[in-house]
Each structure stands twice: as C-alpha cells, then as structure tokens.
A protein has these predicted regions:
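Gly/Ser/Thr-rich loops at beta-strand to alpha-helix junctions
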Residues: 19-30, 64-68, 144-150
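Short, glycine-/small-residue-rich phosphate/pyrophosphate-handling segment
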Residues: 53-93, 180-208
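Extended, charge-rich low-complexity interaction segments
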Residues: 9-10, 118-133, 194-208
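Glycine/small-residue-rich loop that forms an oxyanion/phosphate-binding "nest" at active or ligand-binding sites
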Residues: 2-51
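Periplasmic-binding protein-like
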Residues: 11-21, 138-146, 169
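Active-site rim beta-loop-alpha module in soluble metabolic enzymes
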Residues: 75-144
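Metallocofactor- and cofactor-centric catalytic cores in central/energy metabolism, strongly enriched
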Residues: 1-16, 131-137, 156-158, 165, ...
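Short, acidic/small-residue loops that bind anionic groups at enzyme active sites
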Residues: 31-55, 157-176
Length: 208
C-alpha cells in the first residue's frame, strides 16, 4: 500500500488519492506520505463518518461480521466519533477467509436482489437499520464493509417506504466526493498532524 501511494505521489500525476476499502488499510500511513506533496488522501469509513455527522446528530454502522465490527469500532475511536456513533449493527454474514472458501453469501445476495428476488441478507440489513433508528437513535446510516456498499439505494428506498427519511451513505462515493472537495479547497492534511521527519518548527507541548 505505502509503496503504491509513494509512487503515485512522486509521479505528480494526481491531485488526490482515494483508498477503496471499508476497513481503511494503510490510511494513516498514506496521509503521512502524501502530505509533503500536497496530495489529499481519503478513505471510505473516514469520509462516511464525516459526512454522516453533517447530516444528523448520530449515525449507526450496518456491518457484516463480528471481526469487522470490532475493526470498525477501532476506526470510530481513531477518527474520534465515539460520541456521534449510536451503534454498530451486525447482520452476521462474514466474508470467506482462509481456511474457509467458497463464494461470498453477500455477493450471492447482491445477484439475487438485482434479479428482483428475495434475499435474507437484504432483509437482515433492513431489520437492523430499522432497529438502529428506533432503538439506538441513529439519524444517519453508513455501511461498514465495501462488500455491502451496493445496498445503499435499495436500503434508502425500503426505509423511505417505511416512512423513515434517513440518509444512507456508502464509502466509495463518500471518499471520492470528499477527495474532490479537498482538491477544490486546495487542502490535503495538516502539517502539524502529519509532520515530516525534519520540520523547520516544532511544538514544545501538545494538548489533546
């Protein structure tokens, strides 16, 4: 990841870099690498959480497995949204990982839904979304794993049919839109948050 980001920065061909993965592997390192080049770096969870807090008071995450739930919990803490995150709701359809194999149940569900067929996974996502709203106080929903991002328009439509006018965000469009906004604003990352190894000025004290 870091070598690819460095190569992209050194090529001077890009104004921004978008990391497409719900779990944000290498995001902090990529921002640190890109900052001296003035290149914005965005990632899915980071972008969704920031947009979500502009749209409502609290958001909930619709996610697919225990292991990813806990990883996403760490992202919520890392990005300092623990006071704005109402809950992480788990539909419990893990992606196949070694030593397990076979086609993803989520991928099969997507094909079913696109054919207009019933999908238990889709219904689980709707059920957990309603619970997040009615029980947890969520006012915005975000999708945790990139394997679920295809659900956004269907989830939005089904919730609206239930009378729940709530924004649903997915990571790809959020990360790309934020990257464009940062380029338009002419900003990347703060040099005080991501300092270089030999910055000209240094701070004697940091307050958090």
């Amino acid at each position: 990841m870091s070598s690819g980001v460095r190569e992209a920065c050194e090529s001077r061909k890009y104004n921004a870099i978008v990391l497409l993965g719900g779990g944000e592997p290498g995001f902090i390192e990529s921002r640190e690498i890109a900052r001296p080049y003035g290149i914005a770096v965005t990632a899915c969870g980071f972008s969704q959480m920031h947009f979500a807090t502009m749209l409502g008071n609290r958001f909930s995450v619709i996610d697919l497995s225990e292991v990813h739930n806990m990883h996403y919990y760490d992202l919520v803490i890392k990005h300092r949204f623990e006071n704005r995150c109402a809950s992480i709701r788990n539909i419990n359809y893990p992606l196949p990982r070694p030593p397990y194999s076979g086609e993803s149940q989520v991928h099969l569900a997507k094909n079913k839904v696109m054919r207009g067929e019933f999908s238990e996974i889709m219904e689980s996502a709707i059920h957990e979304s309603v619970s997040a709203i009615e029980e947890d106080g969520a006012e915005v929903l975000i999708l945790g794993c990139s394997a679920l991002f295809w659900m956004k328009p269907i989830l939005q439509k089904r919730l609206a049919e239930l009378g729940l006018e709530i924004p649903v965000l997915e990571g790809y469009s959020s990360a790309i839109t934020l990257a464009k906004a940062m380029v338009d604003l002419g900003v990347s990352s703060s040099g005080l948050t991501y300092p270089g190894p030999h910055d000209k000025k240094w701070r004697r004290k940091k307050l958090f």
